[in-house]
Amino acid sequence: MVIPAELIQKALKQQSGWGFTEGLVLGQLSVIITVIIILKFVIFAENKSPKKGNDMTAVSAKDKEAEHVAMGGQTANGVKTSGVRRNKSSTNLRNRLATGAAGASISRPGSSRVSMVRSTSGAVPVLGQNGGATPRGMAGSSVAGSTSNLAVPVPTTPTIAEGIEPENDSTLQDDSAIIDLDLDLDLSPVDEILHKTCYQLSSHAPESLDWFNVLVAQIITQLRFDAKANNNLNLLNSLDAAFNSKRPDFIDRINVTEINLGDDYPILSNCKITHKGTGPAGSGAASGNNMPNNAEYDDSRLEAQMDIDLSDTITLGIETRLNLNQPKILSPFLSLSTSLPVSLSVTIVRFTARLNISLYQQIEQTEEDEKDKRDTILSINFEPDYKLQLSVKSLVGSRSRLQNVPTLESLVDSKIQKWFRDHYVEPHQMIFILPSLWPRKKRSATAGAAGTATGADTASGSS
């Protein structure tokens, strides 16, 4: 029996009540509904607040008090605050406050602003110079006997710290702010410089000073170029005048015959800033400076210490005559004298030392001025463990000349070493008085009148 195809298609249409179009529309609607549910209940879901119905009132009161504190108002205890900062989502800080010791402080290192948190155990925090807070019950006798510490009594009600929200909102009505006090720490100018420049004297590593070596080399190159501009005539004339200004009678005129400024440069390294204390002018640290006896010095100053190494050939050659057995009585009438020609050449071969450079103030008490005179001093000296290697060459006589006499060489070497120690080796120092950039006030009327009278007397005497 054969069933017609029309009957089969009609039966299939009666069994399937949905067509392709109806299925497509139903699928799209289901996808849209699913997306809407996800967006509403998952992504844009409102946070459920664990607080009770009266929390909104407490939060509004807390915000009003925060605005009052931020504008520079006063809290219930009469303590002026500078600002409050909160963060509602800081769970880690809440846990840290819950597990921390009572009365602990939150402070920022390297700043003069200190944060105070009131203690819940009734302890009175004590502020030291480093900004840390210590409960009075745990400070001990050392804190009680210190006169530089600052004790701030605070109530025992718990408050909030920076970014920490308390669990109980009922305490926000009175005490709910952290107090930021601007403490003017009594720091010396040297300590303040170190604090603001973040330089730790104990932990800072020495510096190489490569850039400074290049700068010094350029300066030395310019000095050598200026000296050789006129065949060293200007330099030779200056040295001749310096040598012949003060010389004994048995030495004839000194003539500079050779000068060599070298072709190498000093190398500075291992520079470090130290904190060096100095005493009054009469102590050993200030001896040999040709300073006034009534000068005083600061208790402490910064000092730059660095190693210097110079390997070069800096040569100075002179010639003169030694006048021997010259009779003083017959010298106006007869020129009976015996002279011995001497030629010397001194060369600096190697110099290594530890260089100290410091900048401090000298306070000089004057009778004319009511105020003391302050001068800025730049001092330079070397430590005693220096090494100065010299090469001395000599030539004595006119006809039968003696070359490189050991006795004369050792004598010249010892004299130069002694002169260097007496002028530039610690405790002696080479000082430079730096000029003031700002004009100083005129002296008192008495001093001005005395100066005018002195000038008038001088003018009358010259006329």
Curated annotation (Swiss-Prot):
It is found in: Endoplasmic reticulum membrane. It is a single-pass type I membrane protein. It comes from the Eukaryota. GO terms for molecular function: lipid binding. Residues 45-463 are cytoplasmic. GO terms for cellular component: endoplasmic reticulum; endoplasmic reticulum membrane; ERMES complex. Residues 205-435 form the SMP-LTD domain. CDD domains: SMP_Mmm1. GO terms for biological process: aminophospholipid transport; intermembrane lipid transfer; mitochondrial genome maintenance; mitochondrion-endoplasmic reticulum membrane tethering; protein insertion into mitochondrial outer membrane. Pfam families: MMM1. The keyword Transmembrane helix applies. Keywords: Endoplasmic reticulum, Lipid transport, Lipid-binding, Membrane, Transmembrane, Transmembrane helix, Transport. Residues 72-152 are annotated as: Disordered. Residues 108-122 have a biased composition (Polar residues). The chain crosses the membrane at residues 24-44. Residues 1-23 are lumenal. Homodimer. Component of the ER-mitochondria encounter structure (ERMES) or MDM complex, composed of MMM1, MDM10, MDM12 and MDM34. A MMM1 homodimer associates with one molecule of MDM12 on each side in a pairwise head-to-tail manner, and the SMP-LTD domains of MMM1 and MDM12 generate a continuous hydrophobic tunnel for phospholipid trafficking. The SMP-LTD domain is a barrel-like domain that can bind various types of glycerophospholipids in its interior and mediate their transfer between two adjacent bilayers. Belongs to the MMM1 family. Component of the ERMES/MDM complex, which serves as a molecular tether to connect the endoplasmic reticulum (ER) and mitochondria. Components of this complex are involved in the control of mitochondrial shape and protein biogenesis, and function in nonvesicular lipid trafficking between the ER and mitochondria. The MDM12-MMM1 subcomplex functions in the major beta-barrel assembly pathway that is responsible for biogenesis of all outer membrane beta-barrel proteins, and acts in a late step after the SAM complex. This is Maintenance of mitochondrial morphology protein 1-2. It comes from Yarrowia lipolytica (strain CLIB 122 / E 150) (Yeast). The gene is MMM1-2.
